[in-house]
């Protein structure tokens, strides 16, 4: 038994989509979450800067005595995950491979779309992972740089959001049967995305898919939390306005949480 928390990092609130699934599947595990909303989005930033910011988030989580770190951010996974994983002596998990694997299982026509930040799409990481496992699958990647700002400003239900999503996704409509939401912010726009793509297109939430891998690693390293613990205390930190973070989190997690401000 290991009652230390699992650490989650993201460029903002998007990683809460992963946390929500973890709380559902593994309610006995403690969580420490850090969202760097003050510097979001990461996607348009240079690689060197993304790596620097990611290490700051990692080092913060290490001060919280975490037993595992989850990169609940596709951009950080694409740029810094391998380096951080090699440097630390605790398990470090990214969201890309679980999402890629789920897309392969989902597609019936071998036509997969991937949407993400400019950096995630430019890295070509999803296409590489998908075609490594299933060379015959065709992958169409599309950067959607306007999606993260919509979520971070809590405008997911606005008419502006609907127009931006419609305009952004039009190149993929009618061309794929599976769409990977290659940014953990994007599930917060899921209803609009599904409406634009149509009911026949299966949406893959890369963040939610990685919770299965978290469970596997907890078992493999024998670091599961206390299954009998009913009241688990989670901690949430943001580099921006805690009230906005709390408002979005309460909608997604369906519970009120305390959010602390931190300066990195």
Curated annotation (Swiss-Prot):
Signal peptide: none annotated. GO terms for biological process: cell wall organization; peptidoglycan biosynthetic process; regulation of cell shape. Transmembrane segments: none annotated. PANTHER family: GLUTAMATE RACEMASE. Pathway: Cell wall biogenesis; peptidoglycan biosynthesis. HAMAP family: Glu_racemase. The gene is murI. It catalyses: L-glutamate = D-glutamate. This is Glutamate racemase. Belongs to the aspartate/glutamate racemases family. InterPro entries: Asp/Glu/hydantoin_racemase (IPR015942), Asp/Glu_race (IPR001920), Asp/Glu_racemase_AS_2 (IPR033134), Glu_race (IPR004391). The keyword Cell wall biogenesis/degradation applies.
């Amino acid at each position: 038994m290991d009652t230390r928390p699992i650490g989650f990092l993201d460029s903002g609130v998007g990683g809460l989509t992963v946390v929500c699934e973890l709380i559902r599947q593994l309610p006995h595990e403690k969580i420490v979450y850090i969202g760097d909303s003050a510097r979001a989005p990461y996607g348009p930033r240079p690689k060197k800067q993304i790596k620097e910011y990611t290490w700051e988030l990692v080092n913060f989580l290490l001060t919280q005595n975490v037993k595992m770190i989850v990169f609940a951010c596709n951009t950080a996974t694409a740029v810094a995950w391998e380096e951080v994983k090699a440097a630390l002596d605790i398990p470090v998990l990214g969201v890309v491979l679980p999402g890629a694997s789920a897309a392969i299982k989902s597609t019936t026509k071998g036509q997969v779309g991937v949407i993400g930040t400019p950096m995630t799409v430019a890295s070509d990481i999803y296409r590489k992972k998908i075609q490594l496992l299933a060379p015959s699958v065709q992958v169409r990647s599309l950067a959607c740089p306007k999606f993260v700002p919509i979520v971070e400003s809590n405008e997911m239900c606005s008419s502006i959001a609907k127009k931006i999503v419609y305009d952004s996704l039009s190149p993929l409509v009618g061309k794929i049967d599976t769409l990977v939401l290659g940014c953990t912010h994007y599930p917060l726009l899921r209803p609009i995305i599904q409406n634009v793509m149509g009911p026949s297109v299966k949406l893959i939430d890369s963040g939610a898919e990685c919770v299965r891998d978290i469970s596997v690693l907890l078992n493999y390293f024998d670091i599961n939390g206390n299954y009998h613990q009913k009241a688990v205390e989670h901690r949430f930190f943001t580099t921006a306005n805690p009230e906005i973070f709390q408002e979005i989190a309460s909608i997604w997690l369906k519970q009120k949480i305390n959010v602390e401000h931190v300066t990195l």
